């Protein structure tokens, strides 16, 4: 499947016009990861986001001394999107569970795309809001346990 066709199926980008999808497809870089390899590490400064093209990954977050598994991601899922907007440290580690291929999009490429395709930002808002609410819920639960 062509990169543009794959991107068109990602929920964040599914409503974009062909020109916007082509701009994103031209900006992403395909990268492969072996099982057990960290794609991003909690605490590191991120420079971009990733879309999983194939494979599966686990999401780990430190809770005390040991990391806890907080989720699993597969084809079409994306992570690291906060790094598209700011330069704060990564909030979680994402590690490949099996051979995994990701499409990487850097902050500077994303910002250039946003200038000519601002509707992408509107697609990102509900996703960021949902993740913020989940984080808030996790903090509240941790405080009450």
Language-model features, listed with the residues they occupy:
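Short, flexible segments with low predicted structural confidence
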Residues: 21, 65-66, 100, 128
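Signal-transducing coiled-coil/dimerization helices and immediately adjacent hinge/linker segments
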Residues: 140-145
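Cyclic-nucleotide recognition modules
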Residues: 6-9, 69-126, 133
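Conserved polymerase palm-domain catalytic core
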Residues: 1
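Short hydrophobic/aromatic patches on the structural cores and recognition surfaces of FHA
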Residues: 17, 36, 55-57, 76, ...
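Regulatory nucleotide-sensing modules
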Residues: 4, 8-65
């Amino acid at each position: 499947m062509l990169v543009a066709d794959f991107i068109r199926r990602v929920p964040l980008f599914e409503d974009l016009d062909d020109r916007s999808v082509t701009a994103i497809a031209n900006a992403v870089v395909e990268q492969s990861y072996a099982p057990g390899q960290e794609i991003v590490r909690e605490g590191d400064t991120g420079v971009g986001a990733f879309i999983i093209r194939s494979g599966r990954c686990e999401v780990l977050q430190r809770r005390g001394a040991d990391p806890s598994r907080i989720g699993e991601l597969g084809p079409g899922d994306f992570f690291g999107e906060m790094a598209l907007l700011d330069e704060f440290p990564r909030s979680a580690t994402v590690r490949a569970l099996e051979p995994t291929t990701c499409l990487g999009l850097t902050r500077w490429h994303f910002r250039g795309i946003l200038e000519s395709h601002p509707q992408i930002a509107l697609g990102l808002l509900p996703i960021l809001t949902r993740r913020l609410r989940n984080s808030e819920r996790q903090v509240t639960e941790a405080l009450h346990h």
